[in-house]
């Protein structure tokens, strides 16, 4: 069923109601925080944000007698927006409640624009981004390349993961093999697994051990199933594919961090169909296509748009095979989606 279109007044009313609810929640949170800070709080200690629930977060103690225990914590008003994976300084209160007093510096930050175009952090301190796709819903190189550009821009190593490999058949195998060959040629690590049958899961686990990883990819590719296979004790819900669209129904409702037995962590984040790149510049996108590195800056014209200009190094690379047509199409699509002031 198509979504009902709302007029301007209806949208204003919805935003007004949501704003009033948020204000009431913030007031209740402020009262609770004042009560906590007016009571007995423990000493400052370091912690790890493992889940975020609106105005509260779950923090795992990283030191002291409570190490490994999880506390629901309130946030002081002067703190920046916290996300799963953040390292913080906090103080424990009574009955498993605590207060976060400071955010520690992040090594990396994965961000994307929200519905209003404002940058929103998704996860912090991640050093491996696992880009998940599957035979169904049909993978699109453009979406994979958007994730790769985001990973390169954030300084996070990517791993391409084809899940549901048991669904590969004679009909879809040629296109999938051609897709994977492009990324293998570029030097990106690529794994093929089946969370359902368990094939390749040990190889995936060895890639994840010792890293702080995040799974990204459109809904329906089996991210929740992968988490359940890697960490059977979790209760991540799995949703079916829509029979109409072939896309998945969203299941995970909040980003959560899980520990692996042999070390390393996994952040399972809500499924997203489109990963926006409105926060990057044209130069950032060009840097995100690693095969462009030796070509950018060698065009005849400094302001070359790599379209039809004579002496364009990228077009020459396309002719001699150093640049694949699939990747060039993705590059042009991403550039076309950027705001004009990003040029």
Swiss-Prot record:
* A GO CC term attached to the entry: cytoplasm
Q: Name one GO biological process term.
A: ribosomal small subunit biogenesis
Name a GO molecular-function annotation: rRNA binding
Residues binding GTP, per UniProt: 163-166, 217-225
- Give a yes or no for keyword Protease in this entry: no
| Origin superkingdom | Bacteria
**Per its Swiss-Prot or TrEMBL entry, what cofactor is needed?**
Zn(2+)
Query: Where is it predominantly found?
Result: cytoplasm
Locate the residues binding Zn(2+). Answer: 299, 304, 306, 312
Enzyme category, top tier: hydrolase
The cross-references to Pfam families, in alphabetical order and at most eight, read: RsgA_GTPase
Q: What is its EC number?
A: 3.6.1.-
Reply yes or no: does the keyword Transmembrane apply.
no
Alphabetized UniProt keyword annotations: Cytoplasm, GTP-binding, Hydrolase, Metal-binding, Nucleotide-binding, Ribosome biogenesis, RNA-binding, rRNA-binding, Zinc
Q: How does it assemble?
A: Monomer. Associates with 30S ribosomal subunit, binds 16S rRNA.
The name on file for this protein is Small ribosomal subunit biogenesis GTPase RsgA
Organism, per UniProt?
A: Pseudomonas syringae pv. tomato (strain ATCC BAA-871 / DC3000)
Per the record, the gene is: rsgA
